[in-house]
Amino acid sequence: MATPSPTPVPTPTWEQRMNDYVADRFKGRKVVGGAVVIARDGEVLYGRAYGHKNASKNDLVTLDTCFRIASVTKLVSVVGLMQLIEERGIDLDTPVRDIVGFKVINPSFPEQPITIRQVLSHTSSLLQTNHYFQNWETMTVWGPYFSKKDAPGTDYVYSNMNGGLIGAMIEALSGQSVNTYMQENVFGPLGINAAYHPTVLKDKSDIASQLNKKGGNVMTASRIMRESFDDTCNPIEHTDRTSGALYISANGMIRIIAMLEQGGTLDGVRILQPETIQLMMQDQRTIPGSSVQAESKYGLCIAKVEGLPGGTWYGHQGQMEGLSSNIYFQPDTGLSIAVIANGYEAHSEDGVVTIARTFMEKAQEFRTR
């Protein structure tokens, strides 16, 4: 009797190999839960969720799991602010105090106004701090929040305070809470489940816990859902929402960054004008009459990442506790990427966490798919 031939081992498909690659990278970094989504020319070509939503590892992450995405909040939020600036024809060199109706002044340079352009390029002379205050008027009389040696527009310092002012300006201009404005004008039109607190998400069924660098709980999703949230228009007291409080999924993040890559339109829905996005990518020193003289890593809440295959990427990164988040687009290739990693210790190379850089390099394989 003839010996039966061994059953051939199936050759892994390209998607299986990609899934294995993504899982290996997350596992190698000891990530508890994360996701990566890649699009080209506005169309999602690949998405993969990995791991778990919480420290107890009893719920799997999906591409629709909403994470608190830290400073990527700033780029998402500035989309709403730039809409209002477009609609009203506001000059970016307008003093912020003229928009919000309260003082935004460096006490060491009281005669030099802090402008919208300076805030969005992180050249406002506000310093970095993770300590938030009761209201903006309190902040303006406290010198420690401002540089004592560099006037507004003359030096780059990344500051969460700048991000917080985005929300104050949105609320002052729209007369709505930043959450309501963004729901009606950005998230809703793009079909995105996102909110500045999970209790006001449209779909509250898929939320990740906040984890530390060792994968333990900072705040469980169930505890977060017991918090109250003031969803009113109060620009003077809402100080930190647009600096890092947004909850959104990888599927939602890719729609934001793909919209920017596509010149402000996605699936037939226009959010911003193409010239606005070009301005957001630009070195603000080069604008005639600009209130920014300092070299900055940011245009208008958009950073450049150079030195990777395929050309320059544009976008933003977030880091908080054990989470990193990244959204970038690459104009030369039409690629966009969203990466979330939670419950691990992030390491960076040239200002971008290594796990995101790895996936940005791997994304080049999608240029011809």
Please name every model-derived segment.
Residues 324-343:
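Short, well-ordered beta-strand elements
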Residues 12, 284-288, 293, 307, ...:
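Short, gly/Ser/Thr-rich active-site loops of penicillin-recognizing serine hydrolases
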Residues 1-13:
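Ser/Thr-rich, Proline-interspersed low-complexity disordered segments
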Residues 13, 17-21, 71, 76, ...:
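Extracytoplasmic/secreted proteins, especially bacterial periplasmic and envelope-associated proteins
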Residues 49-51, 222-223, 325, 341:
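Short clusters of small/polar residues that mark proteolytic maturation junctions
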Residues 54, 107-314:
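Short, surface-exposed loop or secondary-structure junction motifs
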Residues 27-35, 56-118, 150-162, 241-244, ...:
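Short active-site loop at a secondary-structure junction
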Residues 12-67, 89, 137-147:
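Short, conserved catalytic-motif segment at the N-terminal edge
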